[in-house]
Amino acid sequence: MTITGWLLMYSATDTAKAHTPEEGGRKMSQGKSKKVIAAGLLVMSLTMACNSALAPILAEVGKFFPDASDSAIQIVLTLINLVTLPAMILEPFLESKITKRDIAMIGTFLMLAGALLPQVLSSQLWMLYLSSIIIGVGLSFVVVTSSSLISDYFTGLEKSRIMGFQSIFVSIGGTIIAKGSGLLTAMAGWKRGYLVFLIALPIILIILLTVPKGETTPRVEKGKG
């Protein structure tokens, strides 16, 4: 199972315990139809396989850093996965201050920011590592909040259907990102391969227009009912 698939399972199970149909009903009253919200959440999922963007550029990165070992080059890709899991612990702390929709938008923006970094800083391999770390943190925010928002707005069979469509959109997004990165790399070099993350711009706009802002989630201290 891929890291994204594992995260989807984990966050879906976790959020199913935390939300009730009543919560979803209150949030649905903000004027957005279920179809519009579902569309926004599915579009949000397009970047969940964003690590596929770096696979096509690794060979060219290796040529750019001829003294670096193969394992050192591979870290550029694996760092995204390594960062994503521990970064999940940050999201619950943010929920008490920022709405889930805004956390998802921040996560999508972080992926874009991480991808733009090599356009200006790429002379050292650690700069690409930093880029991957930023992308990984952003990915974590998107994965967790996406599944959580689905649990907020949908229940039962409807929720199961949305989760099924989400898996399809993750796959479609991964394919688009990988193909786009490979094409940009072939046409303009490995640095430009990162520009496939510009897909984040319309995604942020779509999230803003289709997903209700929602409310922050107060943290519940241990030992208190």
Language-model features, listed with the residues they occupy:
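Paired small-residue
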Residues: 126-134
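Extracellular/periplasmic helix-loop-helix junction of adjacent transmembrane segments
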Residues: 58-85
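Interfacial helix-cap and linker-helix signal at transmembrane-aqueous boundaries
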Residues: 61-62, 94-95, 182-188
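Residue-level signature of mid-helix packing/kink "hotspots" within the transmembrane helices
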Residues: 52, 81-89, 174-175
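Helix-loop-helix hairpin linking two adjacent transmembrane segments in secondary transporters
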Residues: 165-209
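Conserved MFS/SLC helix-loop-helix module at the cytosolic interface between two early adjacent transmembrane helices
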Residues: 86-122
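Extracytoplasmic
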Residues: 42-66
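Cytoplasmic helix-loop-helix junction between adjacent transmembrane helices
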Residues: 133-168
